[in-house]
Amino acid sequence: MRVLAIILISLLALWGCRSGPPESQPQPPDGSLFVELGGLAGISRVVDGLLFRIADDQRIVHHFAEADFERLRIQLIEQLCTESGGPCQYQGDSMAEAHAGMSITESEFQAMLEDLAAAMDEEGIAPATQRRLLTRLRPLGRDIIAH
């Protein structure tokens, strides 16, 4: 687990906040969830914090033992950007495909949402904004949680 955290720290240090929306894409209006999350830079910081929390979370870290963290980071940023109404388009697998065979429980899905909320707290995201995002993400559990 310590090795996972060290690898994660190293990768995040290399990535920084290098990604940004293409200038030609329209920006969401002020007051949108995307803007309230701090735009792409804010979402990137939240995802970085989330990945650090996952590395320390004994409830779920085992699901990420073989993860490609660069790909995971990019896909989480795209997904949160898309779900918040930002100018991104999620390019990853469907939630059902991405989580097939992982046997994720409802409590593990909830643990991930808790880690996300803690990462948003750390970034100073307002509680009302956090609730709006989490409300949009909870339905994804239907395709993530093993049935």
Give residue ranges: language-model regions.
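Bacterial N-terminal signal peptides
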Residues: A5-W15
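Core of compact, soluble alpha-helical bundle domains
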Residues: C17-H147
